[in-house]
């Protein structure tokens, strides 16, 4: 009888070990695959385009930035490229209005992955553009995707990295960080700031109220603010010090 119990326990542990090993192998395979894919995309972006190749028209007034044109032809859900120096944040940014959260669990190649790909909230208009462009990205344990935003919790990092780059398909853009804060979502708690609900300001007061709340919650004073008429960029990722926590970096456009 004891031998049967012992064998059953060994079998159970073996099954658990096999399943756990399978998950780990899958995770590391996915990690390596995603890293290789994005490294290849970065190589395209950082390679000088051929001078003989004419850029495509994006609209009647604008043409594609050549290196982004090539990626757009691979996946026309691409709306831009984001980069933060001294982090792993160097990625295409996607938007799928028909399937808003598609890139939460799909990569640039549209294949399923836990890593996802940074993406713009569906009600943000990249063409106008909206007053506030909100981009989401996962906080991955290997430091990829938007995990690098965690560095902004340290004021000394911000002091050396006061701007982020977010290019559209047609314009190179630089944003200046105005606030970095932690909040919670999916709750009616008074600690919850629904920053993701602010996309367009109907009045000067709406815009000012949003910016003031961001500044009030900021982990430190950047000495920078924004005024009605400025264009904002809000970067959001998970923050694990509390349930449903988020770390948010808000910046304003300073060139286009």
Where in the sequence are the language-model features?
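N-terminal Sec-pathway targeting helices
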Residues: 1-14
